Structure formats: C-alpha cells, structure tokens
Amino acid sequence: MLEDLGWGKDTIDVIVFVSSSADYVVPPTACIIQEELGLPETCLSIEIKHGCSGWVVGLNSAASLIMGGCLKRALLLCGDTSTLLHSPFDKETRPLFGDAGSCTALEFDTIASTLEFEHGTRGKDFKSIYTPVGGCRNAVTAKDLEFIEYGPNQLRRNIDCTMDGMNVFAFGMSVAPKSVKRLAEKYVLNLEQMDYLFLHQANHYMNEKIRKKLNFAPEKTPYSLRDFGNTSCASIPVTIIT
C-alpha cells in the first residue's frame, strides 16, 4: 500500500491499531507493529480494543488525530484472529468467524470535507459478547482451562469467548437502523442517493432485515460474509474491497 501511495515510511505520523486479539497483555501490539513495519520512532502508536464497530471507531479516531494538521499521515490497522478467541469445540459459535486484517491510509488535506460519524455505547449488555476470565478482574486458574459442556456441540472453557446470539440479534435489529437514520438526519443526507450501504458482516439474515428497513437495494448492500465469515473489526473494509 505504501508503495502504491508513494509514501515513505518516514512520513507516517501515527498508526492506530484496532483489535480484540492483541499479541500480549503488555506491551500494546501497536508498538510491535511500528517496529515490524520499520516506521520511525517519531511515529505515534495507539491501540484500541474493539470488535464489531472497530473500523468505524478507529476511522473516527485516526481522522480526529490528523484533522488539526499537526499529524499529516495515518495508518488505520484493523485485525482479529477471532477463531483463537473461541473454543475449537464450540460448533455453534466458532464457525461463524474468520480471521482477517485491513489497512486504511488517511492523509490531512486542507480542502477535504469533515468525516461525519454516529456513535454510541451500550455497556449494560457487555456480557452479550464476553470472555469471563483472562483479564485483571478474573485471573485464569487451572479450573478455567477445563472444558464444560453447555449443550450439543458446545464445549467451552472460561477463557473462551461466549456470545448471546439472540441478544446480539435483537440489538442489531433495533439499534442499527435507527443509528443510520440519525446520522442521515443529523447531516442532512438522503439515503436514497447513497451508492452503497456497508454493514458489519455479523449475520446475513439480520443484515437483510436492516437493509430492507433502510430501503436499500440488494445491489447496493455488498457482502463478504459468505467468503470470509464474520471478520470482526475488519469486516467493513474487507467488504469494501471484495
């Protein structure tokens, strides 16, 4: 990408890395990426822990960092090895996910229009997608490494990610369409004039329901889900280039 853009490595001012599957507890993987890419030590490295909404959150963060003009060029790196976060014996959840990464380049431009965003947080539902142990609140014990049967084809450890599929589905159906409409109203956008609707690739059935609620034609709503599964924070950029 840098070669295609004609950007020298020494011109990168900041990298923003978004992931739920960092290499280590410490240090931030963003710092390791700076070294692996051979970027200068003057490059600011920031790491954001986010999943489904990660690319949008990262894009907002990277754009905000360069908007003032002090930092000129940014790389937004989004990637997850989601399959490693789930039990290999959880046949209900693990097959839904794929591993992927993306890189988005941003550059300060004095005549560029401002990027507009609609954000929100619902912290009360944090257990809808949840890994019970492994952080500082609940340290791993020997018992947490034992597999527990939760149902047919569902063997998980406490260190494995769990997902309340029905709650996630209900959230997507109720919140996503309203969020898009609020964005359109806030910035006076005519959704009928939009070229594409790129949705996080969580569930085809759910996304089709959202598409219909927003009156987007099928050809304006691309998918990468069939080929790559749910690729977490990378799903939107993966869909854009697919």
Predicted regions and their residues:
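Claisen-condensing/thiolase-fold acyl-transfer catalytic domains that form or cleave C-C bonds
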Residues: 21-22, 35, 40-42, 47-70, ...
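Short acidic, glycine/serine/threonine-rich loops at helix termini
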Residues: 26-28, 60, 86-90
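Conserved active-site "lid/cap" helical segment
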Residues: 1-13, 140-195, 206-210, 214
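Acidic-glycine-rich active-site phosphate/pyrophosphate-binding loop
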Residues: 25-38, 76-82, 145-152, 206-218
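Acidic, glycine-rich active-site loops and adjacent beta-strand->loop/helix elements
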Residues: 18-24, 50-53, 78-83, 120-122, ...
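Condensing-enzyme catalytic core mediating Claisen C-C bond formation in acyl metabolism
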Residues: 90-170, 174, 178
